[in-house]
Amino acid sequence: MSKVEFNKETGPREVFCGLTSIVWLHRRMPDAFFLVVGSRTCAHLIQSAAGVMIFAEPRFGTAILEEKDLAGLADAHEELDRVVNDLIARRPEIKTLFLVGSCPSEVIKLDLATVAEKLNKRFLGQVRFVNYSGSGIETTFTQGEDGALKALIPLMESSNEEKLLLVGTLANNVEDRFKKIFKNLGISNIESFPPRQSTELPKIGKNTKVLLTQPYLSDTVRDLKHRGCEIISAPFPLGIEGSTEWFLAAAKAFKINELKVHEILSPLINRAKLALESHKEILKGKRLFLLPESQLEISLARFLHNECEMDLVEVGTPYLNKDLMKEEINLLPDNTKIVEGQHVEKQLDRVRESNPDLVVCGMGLANPLEAEGISTKWSIEMVFSPIHGIDQAADLAGLFSKPLRRNQILTTKTLVTH
């Protein structure tokens, strides 16, 4: 393991809540509906993040907790029953309905697990109900997916059939390319979790080999282990290096010759390196500070240092699972400073003191930092963009080179004007 400096902070945080993950999960499973039990603020957050108007009838919605619910003057369970009945009558195509807890529903101790259990009995054979928490009280926004997947695991049937299970939401076109490569390697039985249809859950067991596509699925991994699955230890498929090592780890688990992997990946790697050059010219030697928000920070730091030659000032992450991140940490340069958790005021002080060329942070911090003359990149963009895989390396680098390129153009125009 590289000699990395680990630090831990606690204090005020600045993050989105887990409800945000509904935006990509509802697109992934078009036969599912996500019903948030929360406030008007929850409703505005998801609608804004998804970029759709509510009259378009998206596959998510909010059962609004009014002041009388929060004050205990009304039976929230009865009101929720009414909302669910109306929803299913209006949308009979729904196959799985996720009841998603929020900060307000947790504050009033609304028992969504019991609600889901009762609804499953009432709508048996018609709609399946599961519940999880999207509250941001103790979690960050990507952990919403972790909660959703964990809630589905008890519904997965058992099977001892050997298979590769890709765990974590990917863009459909990226997933298709990954599966094609695995089949070329000789791995034919490949499934994904979450699936593209919520009712087509993969069967799992002792011969299921799990390969993670996202680093924020700690609870999901733990429950898959309890079901007997084998977790393949690998970096995450971001950039050329991470993706190559990811495929190599899968090949090793299935006893496939390493030379075959290099033979199949070589054309992809060569094209990706050429495409990466123009971005590398912008990023090389620039100083990078990553504030904690998505749990993608360590993988991004590895990619931006090793493949784009950026200098790492500090790598923040909201939560660090050293077992899952072991292979990523091994690829970081010596003396990398990793800070788990957040005291946002102290971290902002360190940002100002170090004056980096680029800060990766949440949307709430970006504008204030830009006003101070510090270039930023929203970390949430990494989750909404198809960035996984060798052939996406240039697109991933482009997300970071774009703000620096923009600043160069603005600086040049300012100099010309003066």
Curated annotation (Swiss-Prot):
Tell me one GO biological process term. Answer: light-independent chlorophyll biosynthetic process
Q: Which family does it belong to?
A: Belongs to the BchN/ChlN family.
Q: Does the keyword GTP-binding apply?
A: no
Specify the domain of life of the species encoding this protein.
Bacteria
Q: What is this protein called?
A: Light-independent protochlorophyllide reductase subunit N
Q: How is the cofactor bound?
A: Binds 1 [4Fe-4S] cluster per heterodimer. The cluster is bound at the heterodimer interface by residues from both subunits.
- Subunit description: Protochlorophyllide reductase is composed of three subunits; ChlL, ChlN and ChlB. Forms a heterotetramer of two ChlB and two ChlN subunits.
Pfam families, alphabetically?
A: Oxidored_nitro
Report the gene name: chlN
Q: Where does [4Fe-4S] cluster bind?
A: C17, C42, C103
Against PANTHER family, the record matches this protein to: LIGHT-INDEPENDENT PROTOCHLOROPHYLLIDE REDUCTASE SUBUNIT N
Top EC class, one word = oxidoreductase
Look up and give the organism this protein is from: Prochlorococcus marinus (strain AS9601)
Q: For this protein, what reaction is catalysed? A: chlorophyllide a + oxidized 2[4Fe-4S]-[ferredoxin] + 2 ADP + 2 phosphate = protochlorophyllide a + reduced 2[4Fe-4S]-[ferredoxin] + 2 ATP + 2 H2O
What this chain does, per the record?
Component of the dark-operative protochlorophyllide reductase (DPOR) that uses Mg-ATP and reduced ferredoxin to reduce ring D of protochlorophyllide (Pchlide) to form chlorophyllide a (Chlide). This reaction is light-independent. The NB-protein (ChlN-ChlB) is the catalytic component of the complex.
